[in-house]
Amino acid sequence: MGLSRKEQVFLALLGASGVSGLTALILLLVEATSVLLPTDIKFGIVFDAGSSHTSLFLYQWLANKENGTGVVSQALACQVEGPGISSYTSNAAQAGESLQGCLEEALVLIPEAQHRKTPTFLGATAGMRLLSRKNSSQARDIFAAVTQVLGRSPVDFWGAELLAGQAEGAFGWITVNYGLGTLVKYSFTGEWIQPPEEMLVGALDMGGASTQITFVPGGPILDKSTQADFRLYGSDYSVYTHSYLCFGRDQMLSRLLVGLVQSRPAALLRHPCYLSGYQTTLALGPLYESPCVHATPPLSLPQNLTVEGTGNPGACVSAIRELFNFSSCQGQEDCAFDGVYQPPLRGQFYAFSNFYYTFHFLNLTSRQPLSTVNATIWEFCQRPWKLVEASYPGQDRWLRDYCASGLYILTLLHEGYGFSEETWPSLEFRKQAGGVDIGWTLGYMLNLTGMIPADAPAQWRAESYGVWVAKVVFMVLALVAVVGAALVQLFWLQD
């Protein structure tokens, strides 16, 4: 006996619902794949408290990291108004308050929900190193004031501390090579690769109070006190680095002036590094207050000196050489000056900060040969002050010192570090590397991100849009078939 019409329809609907439901289940289980959600962006703030000024740098990186170190980019550079924090010896509280403006500017760029998650650090360099030598109590008061202001700010304040000269040099080296892509590069195949060691670039930094040289030598570093070791992007690095305190631009100028006073004490000081026709009055006392000056003012001199420029580059170089102790390295192969060990130079070098600012003014950043650099600086030093002053309006603050700074840099690089006519082309004078301002701060943040745990990216079950639509359609068909079968069973009268 055959099935009735009602039974045929009921079984057909029931079968359709089963097929549709099974198809939807297969699509749900088979086509689903693991999909990583977009990773969050994290932020970090570093204050560079230098001897002449303080700068804030805001960095950002993805929460997931490449080989244990975050890929960091610069989001903001802000120069704090006023002098360096070491200048606030008579009003320590003002040192902390001076940081507020740049900090508020940085917080505008960070989502409010991440303010408290943003690591913030202040590193003080040679200016505070000198103040700590001169008056440790004043240095502690300034650090306390800075810590109080940043500690109550809506950030994750990690602390304020004195950065060692060796660390300053090493982190500057990291910044240069990160910006140039010589630490890690993103290949055309979509993979992160490590370039060969020969591509690494040395770093030459000069602040107001110290100067640093850092590079990877061709052999072992014999003086381990000049070696810095760290790990980035899954690779280990050992670099030679040394910081020369009191050899920064501002301290060099002060020492140079004191040396001239000591050699010829008189109420009228003729300065060979100042352009001819320049004249000014300087207070004698403050010149001798720096820990870099190891002399006492001659008793016969008045409190104020009249200083007159003579524009004599030969005499200027002779006075600058007196700031170095070259004789301490006689008979030693691996020695720079002042008896400091230095292995042979190797590879390309980036010279930044005051190296760059001075040579940029003198239009010497186009890799000119050493002979051209020397001739250009000497020619500038022999120009009359009135002519130079008229050619560069509004630059009176630094204008008188470019002759001395240029000849000092030339002496330091050529006679101190040992860049010859042949190796001079390996020098590049730069402010940025790969679109990033060069300094120790980015290198520090790159190293710091190695200590910040990477958030594991969230995984979800997901499928393509077409599969999702098909799954919904089959589920709807299954539901319609089940409802239809139920209605047939309940309301269809028997044949």
Curated annotation (Swiss-Prot):
Extracellular compartment residues: 30-471
What GO molecular function terms would the record report? apyrase activity; ATP binding; GDP phosphatase activity; metal ion binding; ribonucleoside triphosphate phosphatase activity; UDP phosphatase activity
Q: What is known of its domains?
A: The transmembranous domains are involved in regulation of enzyme activity.
Record's function text: Canalicular ectonucleoside NTPDase responsible for the main hepatic NTPDase activity. Ectonucleoside NTPDases catalyze the hydrolysis of gamma- and beta-phosphate residues of nucleotides, playing a central role in concentration of extracellular nucleotides. Has activity toward ATP, ADP, UTP and UDP, but not toward AMP.
Keyword annotations of the record: ATP-binding, Calcium, Cell membrane, Disulfide bond, Glycoprotein, Hydrolase, Magnesium, Membrane, Metal-binding, Nucleotide-binding, Transmembrane, Transmembrane helix
Q: Which residues are glycosylated according to the annotation?
A: 67, 304, 363
List the PROSITE patterns.
Answer: GDA1_CD39_NTPASE
**Name of the coding gene:** ENTPD8
List, alphabetically, the InterPro entries matched. GDA1_CD39_NTPase (IPR000407)
| Subcellular location, record wording | Cell membrane
Q: Which Cys pairs does UniProt list as disulfide-bonded?
A: 78-102, 246-292, 329-335, 381-403
What's the protein here called? Ectonucleoside triphosphate diphosphohydrolase 8
**Segments on the Cytoplasmic side according to the record's topology features:** 1-8, 493-495
What does the record's cofactor remark say about binding? Ca(2+) or Mg(2+). Has lower efficiency with Mg(2+).
Write down the required cofactor(s): Ca(2+); Mg(2+)
Q: Which CDD domains match?
A: ASKHA_NBD_NTPDase8 (cd24113)
Write out the similarity annotation.
Belongs to the GDA1/CD39 NTPase family.
